[in-house]
Structures are given as structure tokens and as C-alpha cells.
Design a protein with these regions (language model features):
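Extracytoplasmic gate region of multi-pass secondary transporters
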Residues: 124-166
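Helix-breaking motifs and short loop linkers at transmembrane-helix boundaries and internal kinks
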Residues: 10-16, 155, 208-210
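Paired small-residue
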Residues: 3-4, 12-24, 213-221
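C-terminal membrane-cytosol helix-exit motif in multi-pass small-molecule transporters
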Residues: 87-106, 298-299
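A late C-terminal transmembrane helix in Major Facilitator Superfamily
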Residues: 240-279
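Cytoplasmic helix-loop-helix junction between adjacent transmembrane helices
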Residues: 12-16, 20-58
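A membrane-interface helix-boundary motif in multi-pass transporters
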Residues: 75-88, 273-292
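Helix-to-loop junctions at the C-terminal end of transmembrane segments
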Residues: 175-187
Length: 309
């Protein structure tokens, strides 16, 4: 990470910068997939979702603090300075991993390349990946355009929107930790209620978005629910892989991270189509809610599959 961000810092042109960012992005899926399984292995089985939620809380806190801090550094010291800062954080992260991650971790069963490809053929895992992609697709239909929604529809000033987004980020971190506790015992059942609640709040946001007070209340609830399912989804994927394809836990976890990013791309793209169509910005909440309706149906079918097994 240090060297890749350093390449961004010294990039002579746009193409080099983009290629360096792509190289940096390769580490994202690997880090979070392996990090999830390591976090889950460090605690008793009944606390695995909580451990995963704590790890992902670091991501949400980094987004809440890092985005405004990076913007500040870029505005005052230039965009290259932000990559220098990220490179330094990479060194700190490496040192922390070397010092804090135990060396005596139990090695899981190794899996052949053929068995790893079987992850994409496992019905239960496929539906878990679909839950991730559709659930976060619904989130990002709205989240991608949240700032213009709050300014153009709700009527907030840009400076106020920045503060509201900070509150939204805090709610995300809170929801992430809460999701870990709720999903510890039965992640699949917990996910059903999480997705249903998120869909209802997204639908409610369609009606409250024009009211400053009601929109803030709805946004706090939406923030708490936006990433609440992350720990449960990661735990579910790991549990299915452990049971049906031992040794492929890291691979399954990595594909789930990929599904998360695919969901972001789908949601953002769908939101863009809606915003530029006759439906407009105001329709993004109920379109996002439709994504969650589909996610709930997928989850119900996944519960049915688990009962058969």
C-alpha cells in the first residue's frame, strides 16, 4: 500500500495516476476478505459477527474522518500531499499488523484451485453474494446522490450538508457495531430484519426528504441501517464456506467484498439513470427501496435453502 500510494504521489500524469489507483485497489478485496476471517478466528464462535463489525467499524470511521481530512489537506497543500499522508498511514497500518496480529493463528484447511472455483457454483453462496450486491445497490442509489438531494430538495446549505453527512457517518459506525451484536447467533435471520427495516426507512425517506427536521431523523436511521448488514453478510459467507467448501473461506469472503463493490457500481449507475430521467432526484429513495424488496425476497429464499440443508 505504501509503494502504490507513493506512485500516486509522484505520478507524472492522469493515466499513471489511474493505473496506480487500480493497483492500490487490488489490495482492498484481499485485505478485507482475509481481515474478516482473521477477526472471526480471534474470538469465540458466538462473537464472530461482533469481531467482524469492529474491523469494519474502522473502515466507516476512516471514511467519516478521512474524507474531510483528505479534502482539507488537498485544498491547502495540494492533491499529492493527500497520497503522502495515505502512504504514512500505510506504514502505520503495517506496523500495527506486525505488532498486534498474533503469530500463532490456527491455519485453516487448504483448498485446491478447483475447489476454490466451486465457490461460484455453490447455490447458497451465490444467493449470499446476491444479497450483498442488491442490498448495497439499494443503499448507493441514494447515498451517491445524498448531497445534491439534501441541497436541492430538502433545501440545506452546502456547509450544513457537510455536518449532516458527518452525523450520517457516525450513525453508520453505530449501526455497524450493532449489526455485529445482532448477527452473532443467527446471521441469516438477522439479515432478513435488517434488510426489511432498511427498505422501509428508504421508502419513508421519499416522503420525509422535503422536511428538514424529518429528513435528518430519517437519515440518522438510514445511516444506522446502511452498513448494519456488513458483519452478518461476511459471517454468513464464512459459515457457508466452512460447512460446504472447507478451506475456501478467504476466497468466499473476497468474492463477497467484490459483490459489495458491484452493488456500489450498480446502485450508483441506477441512481444516475434515475437522476437524469423524468423521475429525478426525488425518486431515488423509493427506487432504492425496491432494491431492498428484492434483497428481502433473496434472503427469504436463502433461509429456505438453509432449512433444507
Amino acid at each position: 500500500m505504501f509503494f502504490r500510494n507513493k506512485i500516486c504521489d509522484i505520478a507524472p500524469g492522469f493515466i499513471t495516476l489511474v493505473l496506480a489507483r487500480i493497483l492500490t485497489g487490488f489490495a482492498h478485496g484481499v485485505y478485507f476478505s482475509i481481515g474478516s476471517t482473521i477477526a472471526a478466528s480471534l474470538v469465540p464462535e458466538e462473537k464472530r459477527a461482533t469481531a467482524i463489525s469492529i474491523m469494519f467499524a474502522g473502515l466507516t470511521l476512516a471514511i467519516v474522518t478521512g474524507v474531510p481530512l483528505g479534502t482539507f489537506i488537498g485544498q491547502h497543500f495540494g492533491w499529492r500531499a493527500t497520497f503522502i499522508g495515505v502512504s504514512i498511514l500505510g506504514i502505520i497500518g503495517l506496523a500495527a499488523s506486525l505488532l498486534l496480529v498474533p503469530n500463532n493463528l490456527k491455519n485453516g484447511k487448504s483448498a485446491s484451485l478447483k475447489s476454490q472455483f466451486k465457490v461460484l457454483g455453490n447455490k447458497r453462496l451465490i444467493f449470499a453474494f446476491l444479497m450483498t450486491a442488491m442490498g448495497y445497490g439499494g443503499t448507493f442509489v441514494v447515498f451517491t446522490y445524498l448531497s445534491p438531494i439534501l441541497q436541492k430538495i430538502t433545501g440545506f446549505q452546502e456547509s450544513t450538508v457537510t455536518f449532516i453527512l458527518l452525523i450520517y457517518g457516525i450513525a453508520i459506525a453505530f449501526g455497524n457495531l450493532l449489526g455485529g451484536k445482532v448477527a452473532n447467533k443467527n446471521p441469516l435471520k438477522a439479515l432478513l430484519w435488517m434488510f426489511a427495516a432498511q427498505g422501509l426507512v428508504l421508502f419513508a425517506f421519499y416522503f420525509t426528504v422535503s422536511s428538514p427536521v424529518l429528513s435528518i431523523i430519517t437519515l440518522f436511521l438510514l445511516g444506522a441501517l446502511s452498513f448494519v448488514s456488513v458483519p452478518g453478510l461476511q459471517l454468513l459467507v464464512v459459515q457457508i464456506a466452512e460447512k460446504e467448501l472447507p478451506g475456501t473461506e478467504d476466497v468466499a469472503s473476497g468474492i463477497n467484498i467484490a459483490a459489495f463493490n458491484i452493488g456500489i457500481a450498480i446502485g450508483s449507475y441506477a441512481g444516475g439513470i434515475i437522476v437524469t430521467s423524468s423521475l429525478g432526484l426525488a425518486s431515488t429513495p423509493w427506487i432504492g427501496a425496491l432494491f431492498l424488496v428484492i434483497t428481502v425476497l433473496i434472503t427469504l429464499y436463502s433461509i429456505r435453502l438453509s432449512k433444507k440443508d
